[in-house]
Design a protein with these regions (language model features):
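Non-catalytic, well-ordered alpha-helical scaffold segments
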Residues: 51, 55, 82-83, 103-106, ...
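Conserved beta-strand scaffold positions in the cores of enzyme catalytic domains, especially
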Residues: 16-18, 102-105
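Substrate-recognition/cap helix-loop segment adjacent to the acidic, metal-dependent catalytic center
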Residues: 79-101
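Acidic, Mg2+-coordinating catalytic module of metal-dependent nucleases/exonucleases
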Residues: 72-79, 83-84, 121-162
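Conserved non-catalytic scaffold segment of RNase H-like nuclease domains
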Residues: 1-79
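Substrate-binding/catalytic groove segments of enzymes
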Residues: 92-96, 115-123, 157
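Residue-level signal for well-ordered alpha-helical scaffold segments within enzymatic catalytic domains
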Residues: 56-59, 83, 87, 110, ...
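Active-site-proximal helix-loop-helix substrate-binding element of RNase H-like nuclease domains
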Residues: 23-43, 103-144
Length: 162
């Protein structure tokens, strides 16, 4: 289950979105759940329904993307996060506002810095680029952290941000 959504604009991480969702099933991996710090019973009473959460997510995207822009899903190991978001967008809204438009930060770093794949761990990237933030498994904080990594890679290789 997708239990929380965190997003931010990569060029303005203070412009962001966060919500927690009600679980859609009672099946879960205890180890994976323990990393999140969530309690499923609490989320059942406080989380948004998937329909509402995805609609709110789309509303936030629409409010932050101008008519001549397209939203791009940027993530660290983008295939993992995008697959959950794509499934929920399609199941609950019928379409994904990102479509298939995405950028994978790991792959971007791998290509720009010509490193071994083992060196694309976020901890190695943080060390090399002197990132100030870290990942803590909170969806919003992770999105802001990933935006920092994305911008540091661009600054290092292109001398500018997006």
């Amino acid at each position: 289950d997708l239990l929380s959504i965190g997003m931010c604009l990569v060029d303005k991480p203070t412009v962001n979105f966060y919500c927690e969702l009600k679980p859609i099933s009672n099946k879960y991996d205890p180890e994976a759940l323990s990393v999140t710090g969530f309690n499923l019973d609490t989320l059942l009473s406080t989380g948004l329904s998937a329909n509402v959460a995805m609609a709110e997510c789309c509303k936030w995207i629409d409010q932050n993307v101008t008519a001549n822009e397209i939203p791009i899903f940027v993530g660290f190991n983008v295939g993992f996060d995008w697959s959950f978001m794509n499934y929920y967008f399609l199941k609950y809204l019928g379409s994904n506002p990102f479509g298939y438009t995405s950028i994978d930060i790991k792959s971007m770093y791998f290509g720009y810095f010509d490193v071994n794949w083992a060196d694309t761990k976020s901890s190695k990237i943080v060390e090399r680029l002197k990132a100030k933030l870290t990942s803590n498994h909170n969806a919003l904080q992770d999105a802001i952290f990933q935006a920092e990594l994305f911008n540091l890679i661009l600054e290092e290789k292109m001398g500018d941000k997006l």
